[in-house]
């Protein structure tokens, strides 16, 4: 798994050494990594990292707590889901960044705004995947439960919920990544004083490219770690999927 990053850093180093890109625009990878490690080991970068992480987790938790149960309930009644499917698909297809002015009007320039717009974008992903997980549950297992005399409630809690776990986890994994993306975009453009997004755009404006690239690497590392965490959780909790 380290081969890809190693190749990337070698290419990056060669580009800098042969001055294919001016050093003022692209510092060496080793200088960037040094800035990253110093900043994360007690520098101001660690504080901005923490702000972005907290906002991302807040947005994700709101999306998960609301999206999973609502998605499962809608999925258990396909007619109810079809009645709101257009609205869900419409907003799911709308770039969340296009909704920033709307959220600015509602919440103003505040941390709540950043969390709210990220939670909204992530919520639609969770809701969609949870609902479709229930709708597309294996018909054989549902029929087997009916044959054994299970009630609708028993089928819902013992079959449909478990059948929806894998697509729900796929939705959660996508949602946490979406939360991070939207939070960073919001930090860039919604009057933020702290956070990786603010740090990236601020560094770019003053041509502090080492700090800019270090912040980008920190954001990428955060997204990668969050994705790996959910992959591990999915494998442990839904290990029986497909059997």
Name every feature range the model reports, one short phrase each:
Residues 3, 7-8, 46, 50-74, ...:
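Hydrophobic alpha-helical transmembrane segments of multipass integral membrane proteins
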Residues 18-61:
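Periplasmic/extracellular loop-to-transmembrane helix junction in inner-membrane transport proteins
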Residues 47-55, 105-126, 164, 169, ...:
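Loop-to-helix entry region at the N-terminal start of transmembrane alpha-helices
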Residues 69-104, 118, 129-132, 143:
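Cytoplasmic-entry segments and transmembrane alpha-helices of multi-pass inner-membrane transporters
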Residues 78, 135, 166, 170-173, ...:
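C-terminal transmembrane helix and the adjacent membrane-cytosol boundary/short C-terminal tail
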Residues 105, 134, 182-219, 242:
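Glycine-rich helix-loop "coupling/hinge" segments at transmembrane-helix boundaries
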Residues 116, 120, 152-185, 214, ...:
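Transmembrane alpha-helices
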Residues 129-168, 200:
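Short cytoplasmic-facing helical segments at TM-TM junctions of multi-pass membrane proteins
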